[in-house]
């Protein structure tokens, strides 16, 4: 209270242990190696690849620049001229990265199979876990990831757009989105797929050279600090931008 009036301050105080900001050395090298494999993918499987216009079908089409692309669908013989496989074990080589565009129970089963087959890193774009009251399903994914040392980006996110390799899991038709055509030293990390896509389209409009874009969604498989460390170690990326709503944990170890 002052002679000329008063001031009101609105603040929230969180009591407990002081916040310790994560450092690069706190983060697991094994997890970072798995994350790096996603952006160095030589072979990619799309689990749930399907008809044109479906989520899996759009991801398959958008990633067609990749040299080795494997659609996984037990009900199809071919998609986009590529032979389909009933499951990941049927693929004739070890797949580096798998994208899961199937419901939670199928994702859990497929992710376990992927890890057992020597997979290196995954992306889970589907939802239906803790955000709708099924933390048990999310815990199953995390347990598989921890047991095998394989990380996944997601769940419930748009995944990645990598201009260096052509890996693109955005499940939006290209006619609806203007994406950067030039690869370059800028990386973008976003929790929100919508905000992240808006940033990507703004970059395209300004002709900015975007190298890597990531939508982490619920970030149950990999943390934003880990993605920052990954981009910091990537010689191709010199500037990283991030849009986030909040952190559940500071970092994973």
Task: Tell me what each language-model feature is.
Residues 1-253:
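Catalytic-core regions of core metabolic enzymes
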């Amino acid at each position: 209270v002052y002679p000329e009036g008063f001031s009101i301050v609105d603040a929230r105080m969180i009591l407990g242990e002081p916040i310790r900001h994560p450092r690069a050395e706190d983060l697991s090298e094994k997890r970072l190696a798995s994350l790096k494999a996603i952006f160095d993918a030589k072979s990619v499987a799309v689990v749930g690849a399907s008809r044109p216009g479906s989520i899996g079908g759009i991801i398959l089409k958008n990633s067609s620049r990749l040299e080795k692309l494997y659609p996984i669908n037990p009900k199809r013989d071919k998609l986009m001229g590529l032979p389909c496989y009933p499951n990941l074990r049927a693929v004739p080589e070890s797949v580096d990265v798998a994208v899961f565009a199937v419901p939670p129970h199928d994702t859990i089963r497929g992710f376990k199979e992927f890890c057992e087959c020597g997979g290196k890193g995954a992306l889970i774009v589907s939802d239906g876990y803790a955000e709708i009251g099924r933390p048990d399903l999310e815990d199953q994914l995390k347990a598989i990831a921890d047991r095998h040392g394989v990380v996944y980006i997601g769940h419930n996110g748009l995944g990645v757009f990598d201009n260096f390799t052509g890996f693109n899991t955005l499940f939006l038709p290209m006619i609806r989105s203007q994406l950067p055509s030039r690869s370059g030293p800028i990386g973008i990390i976003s929790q929100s797929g919508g905000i992240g896509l808006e940033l990507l389209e703004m970059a395209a409009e300004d002709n900015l050279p975007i190298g890597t874009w990531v939508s982490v969604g619920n970030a149950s498989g990999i943390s934003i600090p880990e993605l920052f460390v990954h981009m910091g170690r990537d010689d191709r990326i010199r500037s990283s931008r991030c849009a986030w709503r909040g952190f559940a944990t500071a970092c994973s170890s």
